[in-house]
Amino acid sequence: MNRTAVFWLVFLTLFISGFMLITDTIKPFFIAFIISYLLQPAIYFIESKLEISNKLASSIIYLIFLSIFFLIFTILIPIIYGQIFTFINNIPKYKNYLQSEILPPIMGKIYSIEPDIADKIKHSLSDFINSIFTILGSIANNFWRYTIITINIFVLFLLIPIILFYFLRDWDKIITNMESLLPIKTRPKILEILSAINNLLSSYIRGQLNICLLLSTYYSIAFTLIGIDLALLLGILTGFLVIIPLLGTFISFLLTLIIGYLTFGITSKLLYIMIIYLIGNIGESYILTPKIIGDKIGLHPLWIIFAIFACGSLFGIIGIFFAIPIAGITKILLLNLIKFYKSSKFYRTDV
């Protein structure tokens, strides 16, 4: 092993060890850095359109962000917190309704066609429902512990706007200094890979965040207009669960349908819920995603499914939410690794 490899091995070991020791301290800095990264396009847009300095553009975006941040914590958070508390109290009622009212008629029709398949579907659905409600029950049982954690997060978030101000102000200088630390010989190649990752992340994360916010607004307003219980909570949940391909919308639709039945009974408003989801799904699939994100991720559906299960198995719920960008980054790294391998003497030399 050469001296360069030893140096980087020791450096990475010390860096990771040090990072793990100060994880709690570094959290607000990490979050502020991510927010600053997400806000950069808005800063560049303001800077070019108004023809002002980068620092002035950063100050304008910072004030806008701070205003939105303040409104969310003073208006939306108390409402959402109250609706979460109501939802947790009603979890047993939702489960009983699903198992006694929704599934029996469906399973009865399947039994009349194919009893063997119906038994398998029944057991699979039962296991799936029990898993979902076990998770929800666990959250309910630990609600007050999560409340204490929420208070700690609130205190943590008080620091974020302060740290964010300095990140926004000195962003270009920070990035330049970070680039200067890269090895001179391999710097162009590393920057090329980082640029590809940045393009992917900026396309997906910023695009997906915009889609989630638009859908959350749409569903929250639509649910409020038809008068369903927990309208704001269900709207935000539905809007952000689209991050999970395939399963996200189905889970939120099923939950909304149950709460809709408990709110209205068997009425035409259940049909309204279906229409709201149909419009939302069409809008997300055929308008928002193609226009905002497009095909820039370039992942095959099978690779997406594999990524969801793999990341979910390794990192839990958080892993599922970040499965697609992780898969995209992995794809970029693998393509570059294959390119390096094909340009190596090992690949080109005949054995």
Swiss-Prot record:
GO biological process terms, semicolon-separated? transmembrane transport
Listed GO CC annotations: plasma membrane
- Spell out the InterPro entries in the cross-references: AI-2E-like (IPR002549)
**What residues form the membrane-spanning segments?**
6-26, 28-48, 60-80, 148-168, 217-237, 239-259, 260-280, 304-324
**Topology class, membrane:** Multi-pass membrane protein
Q: Where does the UniProt annotation locate this protein? A: Cell membrane
What UniProt keywords are attached to this protein's entry? Answer: Cell membrane, Membrane, Transmembrane, Transmembrane helix, Transport
Protein family according to the UniProt entry? Belongs to the autoinducer-2 exporter (AI-2E) (TC 2.A.86) family.
* Protein name, as recorded: Putative transport protein RP630
Q: Please report the organism this UniProt entry assigns to the protein.
A: Rickettsia prowazekii (strain Madrid E)
